[in-house]
Amino acid sequence: MRVILGSDLDGIKLKAEMKQYLLQEKVEVIDKSESASEDFIEATLAVAHEVLKDTESLGIVFDGYGAGSFMTAAKIKGMIVAELSDERSAYMAREHNNARMITVGAKIVGTELAKNIIKEFLTGHYAGGRHQIRVDMLNKMA
């Protein structure tokens, strides 16, 4: 599994902490913003486009509140994204919605919660079946 990371100035510290966490967990990490992007849009687009190149990749963007990056990624055709601040939603975003990318607000989510969100997001597996109908609907929208 490969995880693509990005952040703006507000998310750079949490992104760095989560990058270390992922590397310790033996996850392949690609950091699209080694130095923080000045704007969440730039960081989000870099991560989303990289994720869409490889069906096995997932993306995580850190900004101040998660909302801006979410709105940006949701505009990209083929990208299913969730703005997250709890573990259960992270798991369900993968299992029922086949989310390939999440956004996390560094001013809302602390280090330990971010680790748990990422763990649930990465361990969730898309269930398919009846959920595929809504995934197809989402993919037709953008």
From Swiss-Prot:
InterPro entries: LacA, RpiB_LacA_LacB, RpiB_LacA_LacB_sf. One of its GO terms (biological process) is lactose catabolic process via tagatose-6-phosphate. It catalyses: aldehydo-D-galactose 6-phosphate = keto-D-tagatose 6-phosphate. Pathway: Carbohydrate metabolism; D-galactose 6-phosphate degradation; D-tagatose 6-phosphate from D-galactose 6-phosphate: step 1/1. Pfam families: LacAB_rpiB. Keywords: Isomerase, Lactose metabolism. The keyword Transcription does not apply. GO terms for molecular function: galactose-6-phosphate isomerase activity; ribose-5-phosphate isomerase activity. It comes from the Bacteria. Its EC number is 5.3.1.26. Heteromultimeric protein consisting of LacA and LacB. Belongs to the LacAB/RpiB family. This is Galactose-6-phosphate isomerase subunit LacA.
